[in-house]
Each structure stands twice: as C-alpha cells, then as structure tokens.
Amino acid sequence: KILAEICSEINDSIESIEHIYYSVENNTLGEAALVVINEYGEENFKGIFLSEPKKQGTSRVYRKGFNTTNRSKLTVCATFKNLVETKKLKLASKPLVSQLKNFIASGGSYAAKLGEKDDLVMSLLLTVRMAVLIREFDASLDDRMPQDDQELILPMPFLMS
C-alpha cells in the first residue's frame, strides 16, 4: 500500500502516469513485494512497472522486476561511475554519499563494508538500471545516458568531495 501511495503522490505532482516508473529487485525481499503487488493488483498502482527483459535461450522461469547478479551489478556500477564522472548525475543526498564511501569491491562484485549498509546505493543502482531500460524506448534520453555499445570503463574507486 505504501508503494501505491508513493506512486499516487508522484502522480499528483506531475499529473501524468506515463512518466512514473517503479520496480523491485527480485531477490528475497523483492519477491515479498511482488506478492503484495500481485495481491493488491498492479492496475491499482499509478505508473508503469518495469522488469528486466527475458533473456533469450535461458530455461529460467521469468520473474518480474530486476535480477541482480555479480555481472549485472558490475555493469550498472560502471554505468553509474560514468554518469557521475561525466556530470550527468549529481548526488545531493548526504546519506547516499556516506553509503557510497563504504561500498567496496567484494568477491568479484560490490557490497557494503562489514557492518555498514548499502540499501540507498542498491536503490540508486536499480534506478540507473531502470533508466537504461527506459532509454531503449525513449530517444530523448540518448544524450543523457551512456550507450550500451560505448566502451564502459570498469568500475574503479572514485573519491567524492
């Protein structure tokens, strides 16, 4: 119900459901959210629910939302780094910047340091993945988002002041 209220509040502010996008990471917590969305009725949410496109040639069961793997996390981290370094994304949230300072390479992927949180970082990375997906259908985002076929520099640490 909270997600429906958030979507409704956004709709009241912009008066157009065509520009409201939402999704969940389809991990354990996201699966619970998907059950609630299904029971509440997706049609009762103002906006468009985004899901990762089904990959051809896989036998896995398709699930709504975005599946986060080490590879997808590395890719979105590279995209995020590019957006920050090219000043296409400005971070204004002090708690987010604080979490980014504790978001480190860990076992072939990225995660928060032991004892730290990364929920804001992972929410932002999900938002970046959603923006990349939306760009495929909205040409006006082409100049604001890096293209998939552009050479992406692998994620490296960067300092923010």
Go through each PLM region and give its residues.
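Acidic two-metal-ion nuclease catalytic site recognized across multiple nuclease folds
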Residues: 127-161
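Short, glycine-/Ser/Thr-/acidic-enriched flexible segments
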Residues: 28-29, 96, 115, 128-131
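Long, compositionally biased intrinsically disordered regions
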Residues: 112-115, 137
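Mg2+-dependent endonuclease catalytic cores in nucleic-acid-processing enzymes, primarily RNase H-like
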Residues: 1-109, 158-161
